[in-house]
Amino acid sequence: MLRLASLKFGRLFRYAKVLFAASLLVVMLLNTHSLLSSFQRNELTDRRFLSLNKCPACFGTSWCRKFMNGQLSFEGWGRLRLLDFFNVKNVHFAQYGEPREGSRRVVLKRLGSNHELSELDQRICKKATGRPRCDLVQAMYKTDFARLNGDVRLLTPDVVEGWSDLVHCPSQRLLDRLVRRYAETKDSGSFLLRNLKDTERMQLLLTLAFNPEPLVLQSFPSDEGWPFAKYLGACGRMVAVNYVGEELWSYFNAPWEKRVDLAWQLMEIAEQLTNNDFDFALYLLDVSFDNFAVGPRDGKVIIVDAENVLVADKKLIKQNKPENWDVWYESKFDDCDKEACLSFSKEILCSRATVDHNYYAICQNLLSRHATWRGTSGGLLHDPPAEIAKDGRLEALLDECANPKKRYGRFKSAKELREYLAQLSNNAR
């Protein structure tokens, strides 16, 4: 009986797929004219498509000239707006061309789904007018995004604390860094807010509240060795970042030597974001195989989704000395039945000088046998060679890093794991 039900379900699933494909074909045939025009027209030069008409309720304008000049165009099937229905994250691939440099691939992001962007518009309107629809441009001047006028000297923690993960517990030092490195102004380099235009201040604050990823990329740039994708610019509600390469997930079944190297890099990223010369701890609150990519030439691992990064100023923690500030904090292992689970307390991340969160996140969600993603298990270091499996050291270190049995076991095992992976990687070369 069970087998019969399974067969029936299988047939129904196949029929559903066929019906879906047929429906899609019909829709495409009915929209042949619009499909052809989509291929012929470069919508990245359209102000309304870019939501440039909504500025300053947007993310910036630094790249608008490049968009309007036709220097950016969607790749292949990405030109079909019909397929946007399936692109929930609103992430697109495009070609960007410079006259003397040729073209290269870039990634375009709207920083949210259509639903999230629509909700943003409604919140702005309700705040300003009490109604869900309004003139966004006028409404922006009646919101918290416009509360900082030209007389305000600094962006201070009391204004933006808790707006997003980036500023869950902001220090003045962090906010000065965000303003000084803000790329959507011609006069960047100063931490004084009054050097920004009114519209630029509003765009900065809106980005900080809606999705601070651009500000993370600008404040901790790849040019200075931070493991994030390079920020290029914005036009309206379309942000351009450098294309890194295939996502980490595509290397899940790569040769063992390659996976060992990637695992070592991931642990190095965890270390860099936790302990660095700037005394900022950047904690990754969303860690999955989709949030990292690998460069095709240099094989370098880069973070490509930085929306959920909490920055704690360890210099301020050491200065203010909140309760238990110097007690090492061990993150709690989360044995949940969902993908990419993490257990953390933002308040503790903000108040302890020594935290193992990044090691925990990388080990549990990417490297160890506890990592699950898209129906797979075993993590990036699954199925090691027989001699390594027999030795047992790798499995023991991964287990202790993900789910420590000893006090402060994760701190010790993370350090040993980095060293062991470096050794394995060197031996494989």
Swiss-Prot record:
Name-wise, this protein is Divergent protein kinase domain 2A
Q: Which domain of life is it from?
A: Eukaryota
Name the encoding gene, please. Answer: dipk2a
Cross-referenced Pfam families, in alphabetical order? PIP49_C (PF12260)
What is the species listed in this Swiss-Prot or TrEMBL entry? Xenopus tropicalis
- Assigned protein family: Belongs to the DIPK family.
Q: GO:BP terms for this protein?
A: cardiac muscle cell proliferation; regulation of phosphatidylinositol 3-kinase/protein kinase B signal transduction
Q: What does this protein do?
A: May play a role in cardiomyocyte proliferation through paracrine signaling and activation of the PPI3K-AKT-CDK7 signaling cascade.
Which keywords annotate this record?
Cytoplasmic vesicle, Golgi apparatus, Secreted, Signal
**Which coarse location class applies to the principal site listed for this UniProt protein?**
cytoplasm
Query: Lineage of the native species?
Result: Eukaryota, Metazoa, Chordata, Craniata, Vertebrata
Write the signal peptide boundaries. 1-34
